[in-house]
Amino acid sequence: MSKPLSDLSAAGVAVWLDDISRERIRTGNLAELARTRSVVGVTSNPTIFQKAIGGGETYNEQLRDLAVRGVDVGEAVRAITAADIRDACDILRPAYDASAGVDGRVSLEVDPRLAHETERTVAEARALWWSVDRPNLFIKIPATKSGLPAITATLAQGISVNVTLIFALDRYEAVMDAFMTGLEQALAAGRDISDVASVASFFVSRVDSEVDGRLAKIGTPKAEALRSKAAIANARLAYELYEKIFSTPRWERLAAAGAKPQRPLWASTSTKDPGLPDTLYVTELIAPGTVNTMPEATLEAFADHGVVPGDTITPNYEDARAVLAELTELGVDMADVVEVLEVEGVRKFEDSWNQLLDTIREQLGSAAS
């Protein structure tokens, strides 16, 4: 067991792996990471699946079966991804049971092409939930304006949700409201809300990539001094919002009925700038009740040389506010930054989804011949 990762878990940060593949499942690697790297959750996305399915032979048998049945490419994608997610859910079921449903969660994303279609997103979430048929599943729904009512409706039906692609503080506040509204509707319908869970995936490194590009164009010493500070400041203030919202009477009523809080999940935590410490977005975002989902390279880096100095979020709220104020003074429009990132985030997942469809369409053709 890695001491840095054990220490991170002890500090209240749930360690999740941002990756999945059939090879990782079948070789026992995921189970090994659960044993030796404190991994208690898994996130996936269309990009991860496209790379996994296009890069190995472990899917060939299922592809042949699907080709023989003559299924269309959409059904094939759902069958293949659901099989991997179901197996990962089973591997992490002990963590789910041990934590009373808090951890041991595995996330599967709805078709990203539906990011701006509320009703179709809800229908897709329901279909994926039934297809995987595991209580420790999270359905990933993007935090677009159309996604917010879909999040509420999905939670109201008793389906656990990972809200993804959150960049803006005001959007995060809307996400928490959508979460509570969904639980209130579920409770009114007589559901046991203790079984309905959620995380809010707040993206980190992409904020620095966008802001640092704008700072480079400004080019002043003050702008240079603010490089690689925006993302951490933004995330820290998100946690402050989390503390505020989940101490309100509204939340206390839900908690009394058995609800679990919607934990902040730090996503996009690998550093894009090679000049930065490779564990930066882990070390600087430590606080109780959070999740950090890491690609394997970041996970192994933290296992090797990560440091847990204690809570690195709550003592730094004023510094975080100062960073965002200085960015505004320099002319960096954070509202525009987060809007650009949301549009790009949806587009990137749509592109990966289309590549995934192309990959499976090609492999179905090869398997049938």
From Swiss-Prot:
Pfam family, one: TAL_FSA
Pathway: Carbohydrate degradation; pentose phosphate pathway; D-glyceraldehyde 3-phosphate and beta-D-fructose 6-phosphate from D-ribose 5-phosphate and D-xylulose 5-phosphate (non-oxidative stage): step 2/3
GO cellular component: cytoplasm
Active site: 140 (schiff-base intermediate with substrate)
CDD domains: Transaldolase_like
Subcellular localization, as worded in the UniProt entry: Cytoplasm
Family stated for the protein in its record: Belongs to the transaldolase family. Type 2 subfamily.
Reaction equations catalysed: D-sedoheptulose 7-phosphate + D-glyceraldehyde 3-phosphate = D-erythrose 4-phosphate + beta-D-fructose 6-phosphate
Keywords of the record: Cytoplasm, Pentose shunt, Schiff base, Transferase
GO biological process, one term: pentose-phosphate shunt
GO molecular function, one term: transaldolase activity
Record bears the keyword Transferase: yes
InterPro entries named in the record: Aldolase_TIM (IPR013785), TAL/FSA (IPR001585), Transaldolase_2 (IPR004732), Transaldolase_AS (IPR018225)
Organism lineage: Bacteria, Bacillati, Actinomycetota, Actinomycetes, Frankiales
Protein name: Transaldolase
Enzyme class (EC, first level): transferase
E.C. no: 2.2.1.2
Gene assigned in the entry: tal
Chief place of localization: cytoplasm
Keyword Ribosomal protein: no
Role summary: Transaldolase is important for the balance of metabolites in the pentose-phosphate pathway.
Species in which this protein is naturally found: Parafrankia sp. (strain EAN1pec)
Positions of disulphide bridges: none
